[in-house]
């Protein structure tokens, strides 16, 4: 089985192996016109890959039948379903081989003359399909069939599954390369490159149900797989966007959807906001969905309820998923608080986060090769969140055992859960940046990590549960992880700051109980648990690590209080030295910093500097030493700036200024002059006030006299003026005289001779207008 290789459809995501089904696309088989568009070289490679796929399928079926079923993965009642699935797989592989032979035969006969023939029906999706309901039900049944065979296999596939199965249906063997090449090439040649995107090609590959199965077989298969829908498929529906409901066909249809948008026709939303955001990001991290591996019965019940809400809009689905993520976080926090008091924790929480996605494929390959070489069965569970020395223990045994190796896996799984939940919002924008940094920082320790994994793989082959052997391996892994903490980037440490503080305290409490049971590795664990606690407390400053010496990476034998005080001193030294001193990176480990002045000394230093400035200002008032004091101040500034750049100058900052003090006599003279000026000003003020008061009195008297004289004159003149006589009678008489003259004039006016002429003319015109109206001319 060493020839078999797992080939993912999306290179970014981790592989997933579905051993039960050979999935075919929902589109009808490629026609002759499409096949002529493919070159002869690709057809030869396709035929060879199909033969290899058939051989791999036959070997895989023989191996499964020879080994039988594993007791942990399948029950005895599922044997008929297992056989029916194998029959379906054989029939599907036979049909695929027959189809490929016919395609090769037609293409070699007809040649490349018909390469530019169009597709017969491009607008099939716009026409009414009477069988739409049956196709919808078949798509739902296939999503049920594509699930893992058991809860253990779901545990194996969940951490490795891609985040968005709408773009990727399943993993195929290396023989299936040819089928994957044909459909995108034909679609691209017909529609053009402008209508095809990388997401479009992957979205076009959909799984369809087997047409040779009857309705009764499909019903039996759905009923037999119903218990696993509640346990594992509901998790995919909740945490994997785009997995619920039948998937729409996207191939050969993008230009039609574009026309629908231009015409204003309503089109259903195929992608939710979360899917579009992650497509732009272009990355998928499997550890974000690995935390529900240890989900209890409550979570399975909650996930089973999601099957009823499969027909909700994508936006509502997104809101429901966000709410359930919050519920899972609360549930796991309660689970963690209950388990921390009962179950000892022997491993720090930062150890899991050291395993970055860049090293995860190597880890998985080593484990899979280990299992294939020793003849283990394919349906065994591979828990990514578990530690390397505890692969063979199921999750149920970990709750009831007090061994340090078994209990060490629990903080790891909880840490992964919190990291995925807390970083859903914050870490998406930082993922690309973190990957670039971690790929450079983790390059040297990768070889040592592979060595540790090889030791652990041999340990899982032997199957021994001896505490001594596993204790040594765990200690080696812990040492490696602690050395790795120094190479972590600052962004990753900030994301896990609050989480690691909480779990390191719990791990220290749990480790005290573990030491009574396993006395072999008690002393080493105590030394190793102190270091991540202190490191997580000061990880936010990246310069802190630069000022650590090479001896800090080793285990410390001092008490935790002395270790904390030592790190606090180093931290303060780093903060103070960063303002003035920036040594080279090569001499970081050998630089010894000077002692820091205490707060009292720094305050006295500030007060002395202020007094020096005041003295300079006061001495500037003297005309004799003004220029001398300026030059002296400039020299002092130059000396202080030059001394700050060196460590020796930093130590000798408190400098005493020499020279003459302030001239007190000149100050006294100035004060006396100021006092005399004030007194003179007061005297002048008093004199002016007196003079103003004397001048103002006669002026007021004169003004009063002047104002009284003209008033009296006016009153006297008014008395002499005679009163006017009333003139009412004269006005009335004059009016009476005028009115009769006006009336006589009106009576004496001659009559207008033209008035009668105008009246006659008006009547004539009226008659003419009436005649026009009768004739309907007007």
Swiss-Prot record:
UniProt lists compositionally biased (Low complexity) regions at: 223-234, 390-402
Per the UniProt entry, what is one GO biological process? brain development
Chain spans, region Disordered: 62-271, 334-408, 631-654, 721-746
Q: Per the record's keyword annotation, is Amino-acid biosynthesis included, yes or no?
A: no
Question: What Pfam families does UniProt report for this protein, alphabetically?
Answer: JHY
Q: Which GO terms describe its cellular component?
A: extracellular region
**Which residues are the signal sequence here?**
none
**Keyword ATP-binding, does the record have it?**
no
Regions of compositional bias (Basic and acidic residues) in chain numbering: 118-139, 733-746
Keywords recorded for this protein, A-Z: Cilium biogenesis/degradation
Q: Where is the composition biased (Basic residues)?
A: 358-371, 633-650
* Residue ranges, compositional bias (Polar residues): 334-344, 375-389
Its biological function?
Answer: Required for the normal development of cilia in brain ependymal cells lining the ventricular surfaces.
Which named protein is this? Jhy protein homolog
């Amino acid at each position: 089985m060493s020839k078999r290789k797992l080939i993912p459809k999306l290179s970014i995501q981790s592989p997933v192996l579905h051993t039960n089904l050979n999935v075919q696309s929902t589109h009808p088989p490629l026609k002759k016109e499409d096949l002529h568009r493919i070159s002869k070289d690709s057809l030869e490679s396709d035929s060879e890959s199909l033969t290899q796929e058939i051989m791999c399928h036959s070997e895989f079926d023989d191996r499964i039948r020879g080994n039988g079923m594993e007791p942990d993965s399948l029950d005895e009642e599922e044997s008929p379903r297992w056989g029916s699935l194998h029959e379906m797989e054989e029939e599907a592989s036979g049909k695929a081989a027959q189809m490929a032979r016919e395609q090769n035969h037609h293409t070699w006969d007809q040649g490349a003359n018909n390469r530019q023939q169009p597709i017969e029906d491009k607008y099939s999706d716009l026409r009414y399909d009477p069988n739409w309901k049956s196709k919808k039900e078949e798509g739902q049944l296939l999503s049920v069939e594509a699930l893992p065979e058991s809860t253990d296999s779901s545990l194996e596939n969940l951490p490795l599954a891609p985040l968005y199965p709408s773009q990727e249906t399943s993993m195929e063997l290396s023989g299936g390369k040819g089928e994957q090449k044909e459909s995108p090439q034909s679609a691209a040649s017909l529609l053009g490159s402008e209508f095809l995107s990388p997401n479009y090609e992957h979205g076009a590959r959909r799984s369809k149900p087997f047409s040779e199965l009857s309705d009764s077989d499909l019903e039996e298969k759905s009923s037999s797989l119903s218990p696993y829908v509640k346990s594992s498929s509901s998790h995919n529906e909740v945490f994997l966007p785009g997995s619920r409901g039948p998937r729409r066909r996207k191939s050969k249809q993008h230009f039609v959807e574009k026309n629908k948008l231009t015409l204003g026709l309503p089109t259903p939303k195929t992608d939710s906001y979360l899917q579009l955001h992650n497509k732009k990001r272009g990355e998928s991290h499997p550890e974000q969905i690995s935390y529900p591996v240890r989900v209890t019965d409550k979570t399975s019940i909650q996930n089973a309820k999601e099957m009823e809400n499969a027909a909700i809009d994508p936006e509502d689905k997104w809101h429901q998923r966000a709410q359930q993520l919050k519920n899972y976080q609360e549930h796991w926090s309660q689970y963690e608080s209950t388990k921390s008091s009962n179950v000892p924790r022997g491993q720090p929480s930062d150890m899991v986060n050291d395993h970055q996605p860049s090293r995860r494929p190597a880890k998985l390959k080593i484990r899979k090769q280990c299992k294939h070489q020793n003849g283990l069965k394919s349906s065994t569970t591979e828990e990514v969140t578990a530690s390397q020395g505890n692969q063979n223990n199921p999750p149920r045994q970990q709750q009831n055992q007090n061994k340090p190796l078994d209990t060490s896996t629990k903080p790891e799984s909880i840490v992964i859960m919190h990291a995925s939940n807390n970083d859903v919002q914050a870490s998406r924008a930082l993922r690309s940046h973190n990957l670039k940094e971690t790929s450079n920082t983790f390059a040297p320790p990768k070889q040592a990590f592979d060595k540790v994994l090889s030791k652990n793989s041999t340990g899982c082959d032997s199957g021994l549960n001896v505490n001594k052997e596993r204790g040594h391996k765990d200690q080696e892994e812990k040492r490696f992880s602690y050395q790795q903490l120094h190479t972590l980037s600052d962004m990753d440490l900030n994301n896990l700051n609050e989480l690691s503080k909480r779990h390191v305290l719990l791990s220290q409490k749990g480790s005290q109980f573990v030491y009574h049971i396993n006395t072999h590795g008690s002393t080493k664990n105590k030394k190793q648990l102190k270091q991540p606690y202190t490191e997580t407390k000061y990880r936010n400053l990246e310069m802190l690590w630069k000022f650590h010496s090479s001896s800090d990476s080793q285990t410390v034998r001092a008490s935790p209080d002395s270790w904390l005080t030592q790190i606090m001193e180093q931290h303060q030294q780093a903060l103070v030295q960063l303002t003035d001193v920036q040594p080279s990176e090569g001499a970081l480990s050998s630089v010894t910093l000077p002692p820091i002045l205490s707060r009292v000394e720094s305050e006295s230093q500030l007060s002395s500097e202020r007094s020096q400035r005041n003295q300079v200002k006061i001495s500037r008032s003297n005309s004799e030493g003004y220029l001398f004091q300026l030059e002296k101040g400039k020299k002092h500034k130059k000396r202080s700036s030059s001394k700050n750049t060196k460590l020796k100058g930093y130590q000798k900052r408190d400098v005493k200024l020499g020279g003459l003090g302030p001239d007190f006599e000149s100050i006294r003279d100035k004060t006396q002059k100021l006092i005399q000026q004030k007194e003179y000003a007061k005297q002048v003020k008093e004199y002016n006030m007196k003079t103003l008061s004397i001048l103002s009195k006669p002026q007021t008297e004169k003004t009063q006299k002047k104002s009284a004289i003209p008033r009296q004159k006016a009153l006297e003149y008014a008395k002499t003026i005679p009163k006017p006589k009333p003139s009412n009678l004269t006005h009335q008489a004059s009016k009476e005289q005028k009115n009769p003259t006006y009336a006589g004039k009106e009576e004496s006016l001659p009559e207008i001779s033209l008035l009668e002429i105008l009246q006659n003319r008006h009547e004539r015109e009226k008659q003419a207008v009436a005649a026009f109206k009768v004739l309907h001319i007007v």
